[in-house]
Amino acid sequence: MAVSLWQQCIGRLQDELSAQQFSMWIRPLQAEMEGDTLVLYAPNRFVLDWVRDKYINSINQFFTEQLGDNAPKLRFDIGSRPSAKPQAPAPAAVKAAAPQPKPGNSFVSQPEPAVSNHRSNINPTYQFDNFVEGKSNQLGKAAALQVAENPGGAYNPLFLYGGTGLGKTHLLHAVGNGIIKNNPNAKVVYMHSERFVQDMVKALQNNAIEEFKRYYRSVDALFIDDIQFFANKDRSQEEFFHTFNALLEGNHQIILTSDRYPKEIDGVEDRLKSRFGWGLTVAIEPPELETRVAILMRKAQESGINLPDEVAFFIAKRLRSNVRELEGALNRVIANANFTGRPITIDFVREALRDLLALQEKLVTIDNIQKTVAEYYKIKMADMLSKRRSRSVARPRQMAMALSKELTNQSLPEIGDAFGGRDHTTVLHACRKIAQLREESHDIKEDYANLIRTLSS
């Protein structure tokens, strides 16, 4: 009875939550009765903790409404419900390996063993263990972990999007390494979208398009980076459309990345953009301050360097756009320290990164943020300083305040002064409000990410 009601509960939650929230947290859950207790099985600890913290009240309320005092107790566990665990499969017949392309060569000229070449592009150094997690990327990592544990399951396809250098490629390789660890014979392919195009062109030139199709449709998991480069390549899109359909029909995992939300990719057919959103779409945002510091400390530790906390915070507060920029800056600091033999101090970092820091301070000012946000929301610059409280003005103003806190080194009182002499508590409220809305509203989350990209580019 309670298990059948669970399906109704899922229906209510689907109506109440956004598509992304439902796909991320509710769809993977499995339910089973044990006595008077309804056990909800989550695929991993992250999903379990999130559901228990965010949705348990809604779930309990539903069962109380339906069953009153007879509502079951709830318990959470990790894994699959016992009755859903399959028996060990009989050994499968070994299929002949499809021809495998070798990097840099003609598609048909280099047939190779399936396992070795299918996973030849997975970088073993990119693991979940060395991926620094923060609020900006925790949903992406959680989804990637679930895919690694259960490829072809709830999150298929998985679409990760965000600016350059934020860790999307790291997650792709981490998933590939996770799948191969669990199943060493898995045929996993990672590639940039341009490589797919090149392989198809070579196949056409060599009259080998059927072999091309067999190869890409025989994989267990296909990961394609920077899918936006398919734009205006009609034949490649046509071939990928059919490859996509074939893999999904076979419950084979697909992960795609892009620098923008699927519907915002110009030059890509609507039928493809629609399919990109069939599974789960997750934004990877620029790392917040604490994550930037953690990235620097992890990188320094891996390099055998003792990086003082105050130096890590100094760099992280001034370089905000992406992980790649942070790591590049730290590499420059380490190289300068090795060449000169000087200790790594804040003054030393100022000298070593003089050009980077000057450029960043020149690009990102409160005035620049106000102008960019006003243009983005199509309001007047004067509205940023006005006392108007209508949502169409107040929300962009709050967004600009939050971005000023994130992207400049100005204090809350200084930010308030720049917004028409407002009190620092008003700025603090704006920052907290935008942080809350980024979790609740897909549109606000998108706006924030777009503005960060614009201001940091």
From Swiss-Prot:
Record-listed ATP binding positions: 165, 167-169
Name of protein: Chromosomal replication initiator protein DnaA
Domain IV, binds dsDNA: region residues: 338-457
Chain segments carrying region Domain I, interacts with DnaA modulators: 1-90
HAMAP family per UniProt: DnaA_bact (MF_00377)
Residue segments, region Domain II: 91-120
Family matches, as InterPro entries: AAA+_ATPase, Chromosome_initiator_DnaA, Chromosome_initiator_DnaA-like, Chromosome_initiator_DnaA_CS, DnaA_C, DnaA_dom, DnaA_N_dom, DnaA_N_sf
Bias-annotated ranges (Low complexity): 84-99
Gene3D superfamilies according to UniProt: 1.10.1750.10, 1.10.8.60, 3.30.300.180, P-loop containing nucleotide triphosphate hydrolases
Described purpose of this protein according to its UniProt entry: Plays an essential role in the initiation and regulation of chromosomal replication. ATP-DnaA binds to the origin of replication (oriC) to initiate formation of the DNA replication initiation complex once per cell cycle. Binds the DnaA box (a 9 base pair repeat at the origin) and separates the double-stranded (ds)DNA. Forms a right-handed helical filament on oriC DNA; dsDNA binds to the exterior of the filament while single-stranded (ss)DNA is stabiized in the filament's interior.
Region described as Disordered: spans on this chain: 79-120
Keywords: ATP-binding, Cytoplasm, DNA replication, DNA-binding, Lipid-binding, Nucleotide-binding
Keyword Transit peptide listed: no
Cellular component annotations (GO), alphabetically ordered: cytoplasm; plasma membrane
